[in-house]
C-alpha cells in the first residue's frame, strides 16, 4: 500500500537523535499496512504514542560541592535561581540524601541532585547503591577547576554497572577570564578550551578503559561551548520513546534545540494523523468534538514548548524594556489566524467540515478533515518554532521593523 511507503519515507527524514520511534516499530507498522491489517497497525501506533506520552525520564546530577550542580540543574529545568522550587545555589552541601527537582512543565521529567561522593563515607559502589542508581536513565558528573579523583572513581563504578554517564566540566567562563587576565599577551581561547578538555580526558582515561567524551559548559550562558553537543549525545543514547520528552524539556536556547523539538513534535503529529487516517470511518461528529476542542490547546502547548507562552513573553518583553503588545508585532504566531472579521478558527473549520460532509459524505469527509487537521498542527508547529528561532537574535528581528503579520486564510477554507 502507498501508506507503507509514505510511512517509511517520512521517518527517513529524521536523524537518529531526533527519531522518537524505534526501527523495529517502524518496520512492524509498515508490515501490517502492507498486509492490509490496519487494526493491528493502529494498535502498534497507539502503543508507540502511549509510550511517548507517558515515558518517565530521571536524570541524576552529581559532583562535589561548589562545582555548579545547582546552577546546572536549574538551567536544565529553565528555572531562575530565585524562583520557587529552584535548587539552592551557593550553599554548603549538608544533606546526604538525593533531592528530586521535577521539571516545571513536564511532570514526567525529574532531575535528581545527588550529594557529591566526597561528602559521603561511601565507596563508589556503595554510593551508587545508596543513591538507587538503577532508577536513573543516565548520570551527569559535574566537575569544576581541578580534577577530583572521586570523579574518576565514580565514573568507573557507573561504567562497571552498565550505566551511561556524561562528564561535564563547568565554570568555563571563569577559566577563560582568569587566563586572559593573567596572560593577556599569549591568551588563546581555543587553546585554553582544548587544554581543559585534554586535562579532564587524560585523568578519566587513567581510571577507565575507554576515552569518554568531556563536555565544557558555561554557567553563565549554557548555549555556549559544548552544551549543544551534550544535548545531541544524550538524545542519541536515549531509547527512542524517551527522546520526545527529553527534547521538550530543553530550553529553546539554540536553533539546534528548537529543531529537535520541532522534529519530535512533527513525528508525533504524523503518527496521530496515520492512526486517524486508518480509522477514518468513525462517526464524523465525534471527530469534530474531539479535535476541534483540542486545536486551541494544541497551539498553546506548542507556544509553551518553544518559550512563547504568555508568561515567557512577559519576561522577554520586560528584559527588552518593551510592552508585550509592541513585542508581539514582530512575531508571527499571535497573528496566525488574524482576520478582518472575528470568526474563530473553530468556526471556520466547522463551516468547512459541514460543506465537505454535505458534498462527499462521512468517510471521505473524515479523511479530508484529518488531512486538514494535520496541516494545521504542522502550521502551528512551524510558526512557533520559527518565531523561537527568530528570537535567538532579537536585535535583528526588531531592526526589520515589520508591521503586524496578518495571515491569509488557507485555500481550503473556501468551498
UniProtKB/Swiss-Prot annotation:
Expressed in thymus and lymph nodes, predominantly T-cells. Not expressed by immature CD4(+) CD8(+) thymocytes (at protein level). Expressed in IFNG-stimulated macrophages. Expressed at low levels in unstimulated astrocytes. Due to sequence similarity with Tgtp1, it is impossible to assign unambiguously experimental data published in the literature to Tgtp1 or Tgtp2 gene. The lineage of its organism: Eukaryota, Metazoa, Chordata, Craniata, Vertebrata. (Microbial infection) Phosphorylated by Toxoplasma gondii ROP17; the phosphorylation leads to disassembly of IRGB6 (TGTP1/TGTP2) polymers into monomers and dimers. Phosphorylated by Toxoplasma gondii ROP18. The modification (Microbial infection) Phosphothreonine is found at residue 89. Monomer, homodimer or homotetramer in the presence of GTP. Forms higher order homooligomers in GTP-dependent manner. SUPFAM superfamilies: P-loop containing nucleoside triphosphate hydrolases. GDP binds at residues 66, 68-70, 90, 171, 173, 219. Residues 55-237 form the IRG-type G domain. Involved in innate cell-autonomous resistance to intracellular pathogens, such as Toxoplasma gondii. During avirulent type II T.gondii infection, recruited to the parasitophorous vacuole (PV) membrane, leading to PV vesiculation and rupture, and subsequent digestion of the parasite within the cytosol. Not recruited to virulent type I T.gondii PV membrane. May confer an antiviral state for vesicular stomatitis virus. Induction: In macrophages, up-regulated by IFNG, but not by IL2, IL4, IL10, nor TNF. Up-regulated by IFNG in lymph node cells and thymocytes and other cell types. In astrocytes, up-regulated by TNF and IFNG; when both cytokines are combined, the effect is synergistic. Due to sequence similarity with Tgtp1, it is impossible to assign unambiguously experimental data published in the literature to Tgtp1 or Tgtp2 gene. This is T-cell-specific guanine nucleotide triphosphate-binding protein 2. Belongs to the TRAFAC class dynamin-like GTPase superfamily. IRG family. GO terms for biological process: defense response to protozoan; innate immune response. Coiled coil: none annotated. GO terms for molecular function: GTP binding; GTPase activity. It catalyses: GTP + H2O = GDP + phosphate + H(+). One of its GO terms (cellular component) is membrane. It comes from the Eukaryota. The keyword Transmembrane does not apply. It is found in: Cytoplasm; Endoplasmic reticulum; Golgi apparatus; Parasitophorous vacuole membrane. Disulfide bonds: none annotated.
